[in-house]
């Protein structure tokens, strides 16, 4: 045995997983520095006296010299100080990589191993997929579970087998955002500056019988079938007229967020503003219908697909919808607003990110930006500035805000601390714009999924700065940027993008 193999280091094992909490704090132990993940997992399972061994991963939280032990993990601590012990790496290699000796004391957080997500299915769409959203209330029946917004202006509803069960025709340019409000209500936003409220009839969610709509009809890449033939085979009843058209923005809508319990919608627009709306059109002021919307479809094929989706349904788009104005339009950004999100637990608070490099906090009760030093003689807007354009946003249960950037990384911000502290952590791995973010299921509040123009979706544990897993597109094309990603426990990870595909990967569940 060499001298290196015989070295040991003092370790304290801690966890935030309530299902893995010991009855009393685990005592410090001396472990060989040659141990890797499996060896550490065996030790922790022995200390916990588990009936069945639990596969574990390890986050090295802190390394301090000469303190006689490691500090207890702080529930409110930022996520940037942890380093994931990668597969194949040992404590010895971690110490060497960080310039540490075995005389330090290590605090190591143990977490359940997250299994890599596997590919489940891929559905063809006629045009680029700008946005996807999973119906969180779906329970495995034949109703639609995925809503997608497409660059041909059509919002499509899909069941879990890839059948198009509804086509929502209203936008005259790219449908860039779509969100479920309830089992039978959705909202969409487009490059035509409009939001649409939809209430598809439940009768339209039936599975088509064999020979009506199947895989052949969904294969829009097939050379033997034209778009017209495939879309004509969808019954007219599966095309839906918008319930209301919402006006207020003067430039394309980039993102939407919904808080169903309070019936509120917020929108991000390229006009630099955040719109506030209701899920009930009766709560919003009636306005005169606009005679035209900007940004109409320029592609002949896209116009044809939209016309076919609309044919025979009796829908007349904007003219058939009730015209409503916003509850409020909140200005303040100096460039396009790229994404919006509600606070994770307070529906009166919202956040927005922009190409102007900033994050703003909004008080929806007053429809104004939150003041960072309200009550003082010189209050200022709570604005957090970064050095790069921000493209995507989601809120996390710990109170953190995750922002995807044009600089290819994800930054974590804590709105509870002063705005002068811009970044709490930086998650690095993507090689192009981070265009979409979605937090993981409630069962693990630290998981996050990101979609990028590099053609991948990455899975993160925000307690460490490196991704856990990378999902590649099954479509082997050169142009495969991911524009939208959503992650729900009832289905898995759904992504869509430049390859005209909606891809489903299963939940990378904890072992």
UniProtKB/Swiss-Prot annotation:
Belongs to the WD repeat WDR12/YTM1 family. PROSITE patterns: WD_REPEATS_1 (PS00678), WD_REPEATS_2 (PS50082), WD_REPEATS_REGION (PS50294). InterPro entries: G-protein_beta_WD-40_rep (IPR020472), NLE (IPR012972), WD40/YVTN_repeat-like_dom_sf (IPR015943), WD40_repeat_CS (IPR019775), WD40_repeat_dom_sf (IPR036322), WD40_rpt (IPR001680), WDR12/Ytm1 (IPR028599). Residues 9-112 are annotated as: Ubiquitin-like (UBL) domain. Component of the NOP7 complex, which is required for maturation of the 25S and 5.8S ribosomal RNAs and formation of the 60S ribosome. Residues 207-228 are annotated as: Disordered. GO terms for molecular function: ribonucleoprotein complex binding. This is Ribosome biogenesis protein YTM1. One of its GO terms (biological process) is ribosomal large subunit biogenesis. Pfam families: NLE, WD40. Keywords: Nucleus, Repeat, Ribosome biogenesis, rRNA processing, WD repeat. Component of the NOP7 complex, composed of ERB1, NOP7 and YTM1. The complex is held together by ERB1, which interacts with NOP7 via its N-terminal domain and with YTM1 via a high-affinity interaction between the seven-bladed beta-propeller domains of the 2 proteins. The NOP7 complex associates with the 66S pre-ribosome. Interacts (via UBL domain) with MDN1 (via VWFA/MIDAS domain). It is found in: Nucleus, Nucleolus; Nucleus, Nucleoplasm. GO terms for cellular component: nucleoplasm; PeBoW complex; preribosome, large subunit precursor. WD repeats lie at residues 124-168, 170-208, 248-287, 332-372, 383-423, 429-470, 477-511. It comes from the Eukaryota. Residues 122-511 are annotated as: Sufficient for interaction with ERB1 and association with 66S pre-ribosomes.
